[in-house]
């Protein structure tokens, strides 16, 4: 190992033998690596005394110019600080998992007739939450089951408050119609309680209670109610056969965490068991960690994932969890957390499946990378570029010149990079002038990049024909940027696969066969630019139409506009309301109601 670029001996002799966190910095002051230690002096010294460091860490050590340390009261506290710093600083040589604070939940609102809904974000009172679930599909599947069995409402409160007759879900027996008083508050509350029991894993208890209620209804000759309860029992039995695991052990909430590294690709598969239900799994791929062991990958995932996610009663893992990590989990949970590193029986089966799922996810990732590499190589060949890997694509979206929005999407490192996408609200171009809109977005984007604020692409894709490409050439020329520009002109009848590529730097046009890998990559990037532009345009248009239509009326500000939209479930509801209906809204006088009605008709 080559000699470090700074006097590490002087640093080491002043380090304490206490627990804490250390940060390795390069000559520019950028953090290269963050680590924790029970003994800072011993741990940091090991980087300069060992000869068995991985190539990745050896490369990091050669760049160290300074070391900073923070002393903590315990190793568990050091672990928390380490993970917070890794999240905040994203050091190049750390294993970094993407933040999964946005795991979905199933929510029951705090309404008198609770709404059942899919929810992402921080839980809020007085709503009741179940989860988190590993993916959105698992939440939606649970909602469908609960709709079918317990017929709970899923509509927004504004819609619920303004219905005069039951909706389609009531007609197909997926809702009990509380909006039109087809079920009492007490009966609906009983259905919600049954759904909660189901989600908490009390299936046998729930079936016994429903059976008791069915018998009582039959004895009271309430045969219609008895038939509904019978249908619920049968539906629950079918779900139980499909989704629930059998052992008492499985009734405990549990996460199964399996780390695998294959061909330099690390992956962690997370399986969630809640209330006896197998909710599904999700594979996580860290940034970095290619040369790390499965044990290091496992520890990094647990430390980062449970910073925000709920900690279950038990974790089943395919490695060893040290005492500091277990203490951290228990402090997060506020109770004992069991770590099972050598499971038996059913849990062993779960762990083996998680390991297999991680390996399959790696194979898929490797296959995808190979496909992307092939597409990229073919793209470089047909565009006559050398090792180009970063592309930016621009598109313009508007409706008859209204609410024009431009998008810029980025393809890099063999994949789309959503965190680098940008939208631009076009303000200087005349409505419908796509050339002026393109000039504005390119000037704004590359004006900053030309000054060194960010990384330039290897080529620029323009969703448009010769006119748009001409504008791009002018703008980049004015900025002194010599970047290859590729125009993607829509083919005959705008059919995919018939696009013509305009290549001004080669002074030619090109039409690839429909199954050409390079064309597939171009279409992927172009379609993403189109999607990103049109979603931004629709949002801007909707906001403009809603705001201007109501707020242009004298006497209507933001607060009253929101009251009207909430009361009537949107602008369409306000437009169909009568003067009498409008006047019933708090703060809306009869005179103002007439003004609103006249403005919208």
From Swiss-Prot:
Molecular-function GO term, any one: excinuclease ABC activity
Domain UVR as annotated: residue spans: 204-239
NCBIfam families linked: PRK00558.1-5 (NF001824), uvrC (TIGR00194)
Keywords: Cytoplasm, DNA damage, DNA excision, DNA repair, Excision nuclease, SOS response
GO biological process, alphabetically ordered: nucleotide-excision repair; SOS response
One Gene Ontology cellular component: excinuclease repair complex
Transmembrane parts of this sequence: none
Principal location class: cytoplasm
Tagged with keyword Cytoplasm: yes
Source domain of life: Bacteria
UniProt family annotation: Belongs to the UvrC family.
SUPFAM superfamilies xref list: C-terminal UvrC-binding domain of UvrB, GIY-YIG endonuclease, RuvA domain 2-like
SMART domains named among the record's database cross-references: GIYc, HhH1
Database matches in Pfam families: GIY-YIG (PF01541), HHH_5 (PF14520), UVR (PF02151), UvrC_RNaseH (PF22920), UvrC_RNaseH_dom (PF08459)
Sequence ranges assigned to domain GIY-YIG in this UniProt record: 17-95
SUBUNIT field: Interacts with UvrB in an incision complex.
Function, as annotated: The UvrABC repair system catalyzes the recognition and processing of DNA lesions. UvrC both incises the 5' and 3' sides of the lesion. The N-terminal half is responsible for the 3' incision and the C-terminal half is responsible for the 5' incision.
Protein name per the record: UvrABC system protein C
Subcellular location: Cytoplasm
